[in-house]
Each structure stands twice: as C-alpha cells, then as structure tokens.
Amino acid sequence: MNLILLLVIGFLVFIGTYMILSLNLIRIVIGISIYTHAGNLIIMSMGHYSNKMTEPLIHGSNTNYVDPLLQAIVLTAIVIGFAMTAFLLVLVYRTYRVTKEANIDVLRGEEDENEQ
C-alpha cells in the first residue's frame, strides 16, 4: 500500500511539474492544483500509526487507526486549494478576456533592444 501511494504521489508531482513548465496559463493553474493534491496525499500518508500503538481512550484493541489532526489539516488544505484554484482560474479568464492570449511568452511583451 505504501509503495502504491508513493508511486501515485511521484506521478502527481511529475505531472504537476510538467504542466507548470508549460506556456499555457490554464495548464499552469491545473499543475498547481495537482501539486496541492500531491501535498495532501503526503500529509495523509504520515497519519497512519503502527499496530503496537493503541487508541488513547480505548484499551485492549490492536486495530489500526489514523491521526484525526492530519485529516483536519488536509481538509483545510483542500478548501484553501480549491479557493486558490478558483481565484487563479478567474485571474486567467480575466487576463484572456483583456489580452486575448493565454500564452506566457506573448504576455511578457517584447524587450527593448536599446536598453541594457
């Protein structure tokens, strides 16, 4: 299970990096969103305890349990990531409406050759 989770996190980081290095603004926003999902999976993977530890209130059972604090942190990160993605999509949409371009190279403008 841990190997599969590690491979999924690595794949998400790879895809996120590939999309962030693209020139299209929409792909960059989607790549940032994929990065947040990879970060959430990393945080969730840290929450599993071993079989030797028991629950703080229930003694005598050897079942696995998960730290609820990390789940709360991930839930907060999901909400913040959704708000950030929505804001960036609106920003990209407004930029496209004003400039009619979604390519970063075109939005940078031309450099003056006379200035040094």
UniProtKB/Swiss-Prot annotation:
<dbReference type="InterPro" id="IPR039428">
    <property type="entry name" value="NUOK/Mnh_C1-like"/>
</dbReference>
<dbReference type="Pfam" id="PF00420">
    <property type="entry name" value="Oxidored_q2"/>
</dbReference>
<feature type="transmembrane region" description="Helical">
    <location>
        <begin position="28"/>
        <end position="48"/>
    </location>
</feature>
<keyword id="KW-1133">Transmembrane helix</keyword>
<feature type="transmembrane region" description="Helical">
    <location>
        <begin position="3"/>
        <end position="23"/>
    </location>
</feature>
<comment type="similarity">
    <text>Belongs to the CPA3 antiporters (TC 2.A.63) subunit C family.</text>
</comment>
<feature type="transmembrane region" description="Helical">
    <location>
        <begin position="72"/>
        <end position="92"/>
    </location>
</feature>
<keyword id="KW-1003">Cell membrane</keyword>
<keyword id="KW-0406">Ion transport</keyword>
<keyword id="KW-0812">Transmembrane</keyword>
<comment type="subunit">
    <text>May form a heterooligomeric complex that consists of seven subunits: mnhA2, mnhB2, mnhC2, mnhD2, mnhE2, mnhF2 and mnhG2.</text>
</comment>
<dbReference type="GO" id="GO:0006811">
    <property type="term" value="P:monoatomic ion transport"/>
</dbReference>
<dbReference type="GO" id="GO:0005886">
    <property type="term" value="C:plasma membrane"/>
</dbReference>
<keyword id="KW-0050">Antiport</keyword>
<protein>
    <recommendedName>
        <fullName>Putative antiporter subunit mnhC2</fullName>
    </recommendedName>
</protein>
<dbReference type="GO" id="GO:0015297">
    <property type="term" value="F:antiporter activity"/>
</dbReference>
<dbReference type="InterPro" id="IPR050601">
    <property type="entry name" value="CPA3_antiporter_subunitC"/>
</dbReference>
<keyword id="KW-0472">Membrane</keyword>
<keyword id="KW-0813">Transport</keyword>
